[in-house]
Structures are given as C-alpha cells and as structure tokens.
C-alpha cells in the first residue's frame, strides 16, 4: 500500500487510540449482521439468530479481537502486506474457503466502526487513508486465491 507520510501518520495516530477488543468485536459483529450470508463461516460460534445475539456473542467478540490483532500487525508492515498476510490468505483460501469479497466487506465495516467511534476526528482525509489500508489488506488476504 502506498501511503503518503501524512496518511501514514494519520493511520498510526488514530490506531494508537483504538480499543482493539471493542472495535474488533463490533466490526466482525456488524459484518455478520449487515451481511448475514457471512455467518455461514461461523457455524461453531453458537447463537447468531438476531443482531443482539451476534453483537453479544463472546466468540464473535474474541474472533473480532483476533482479526484486529492481525490488522494491527499489517499496519506495522504496510510495505509487505502480502508477506504479512500470506499464511492467513492460505488458511482462508485453502481450508476455510472464504469468499475473498468478504475481506473487502469487513474492511469497509471497520471503516464505519472507526468513524462511529472517532466522530469528527475521523476526517475525510483519515478515512481516505484507512480506505487505502483496508483495500490493501483485503488484496493481500485474497492473494492466494489468484
């Protein structure tokens, strides 16, 4: 991902304020509520029968935290996202058979959640930088599918 120094600073400055536990669970939960067909990848997570059940599900929260942990790692390796996400790409492609379009959806949901949490601080410039990052991460996660 090519970010200007200003974009990189904006991304890292905001990310330093992110509560990964909270935002991760909220982002994954929103993905499962807004795009219910994505729930098929989470059969083992128990009750996903309603928005309240999804958002309160401890397995959704735990996996969301794990997802954002990997995203955080990616932020430390923006120049090598494909390498950083190679194993996760292979896992999601070969073993889990996740539609790579879902990575884009999750990235966009993450941007919405960040906007919700940070309000005015999440300026259009910050959003533009995050859109580049989530697109780069989605592309890296889809790499093994090509």
UniProtKB/Swiss-Prot annotation:
Q: Which residues carry this modification: Phosphothreonine?
A: 12
Alphabetized UniProt keyword annotations: Acetylation, Heme, Iron, Metal-binding, Oxygen transport, Phosphoprotein, S-nitrosylation, Transport
Q: Where are the N-acetylvaline residues found in this chain?
A: 1
Q: Does the keyword Magnesium apply?
A: no
Residue positions annotated to bind heme b are 63, 92
Biological source species = Papio cynocephalus
The answer to whether UniProt assigns keyword Lyase to this entry is no
Task: Report the residues modified as Phosphoserine.
Answer: 44
UniProt-recorded name of the protein:
Hemoglobin subunit beta
Reported function: Involved in oxygen transport from the lung to the various peripheral tissues.
């Amino acid at each position: 991902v090519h970010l200007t120094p200003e974009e990189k600073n904006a991304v890292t400055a905001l990310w330093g304020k992110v509560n990964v536990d909270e935002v991760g669970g909220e982002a994954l939960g929103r993905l499962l509520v807004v795009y219910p067909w994505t729930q098929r990848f989470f059969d083992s997570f128990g009750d996903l029968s309603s928005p309240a059940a999804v958002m309160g599900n401890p397995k959704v929260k735990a996996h969301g935290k794990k997802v954002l942990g990997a995203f955080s790692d990616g932020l430390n390796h923006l120049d090598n996202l494909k390498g950083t996400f190679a194993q996760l790409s292979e896992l999601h492609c070969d073993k889990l058979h996740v539609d790579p379009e879902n990575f884009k959806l999750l990235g966009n949901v993450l941007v919405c959640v960040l906007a919700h949490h940070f309000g005015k601080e999440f300026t259009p410039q910050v959003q533009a930088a995050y859109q580049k990052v989530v697109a780069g991460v989605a592309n890296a996660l889809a790499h093994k599918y090509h």
